[in-house]
Amino acid sequence: VPVFIFGHNAFAEGIGEQLAVIELPAAWYMVLVPPVQVSTAEIFASKELTRNTLPIKIPPFSVWQGHNDLEAVVCQRYPEVARCLEWLKRLEHTTIARMSGSGSCVFAEFATEAEAQVAFEQLPSNMKGFVAKGLHHHPLRDLMNE
C-alpha cells in the first residue's frame, strides 16, 4: 500500500501513517489468493490481536525482522489463509513468506524471476495465485517526470 500512497517503497511506522522512503533489493513475488474474504474490522476488533508490539525503528531495520501482527489472528480464523501460507513457507529459495496487510492474500519473496516461476509451477490445482516483479516506485512517477 505505501507505494500507492507515497509513490516509493516505504517503511511504515505507527499504524501505517508515518512513511519513510526505503531502498529494498530487487525481488519477485508469488502471491496466493485464498478463496475467502477477510473482514479487516473483525480482525482489528479481535481480542487475540497483539496490541503491545514493540515498534521497529529504521535503522537497523531488516525485512527479516518485521512481522504482521494480524497474520496469526487471520490464520486462526481462516484456515484457507493458513494453508496457503504454510505451503509458501515450505518452498525453496524464499526469503520471506507472509500475509499481505489484513489478508487474505499471502506472498513469498524470491531473489529472481526464475526462482519465483519454478515455485509457481508447483502450485497445487486448488490454489490460485500469480507471480509479480517488485517495484521500487510507482510507475506513474515515471510518467510524471517525462
Predicted feature locations:
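Short hydrophobic/aromatic beta-strand micro-patches
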Residues: F107-E109
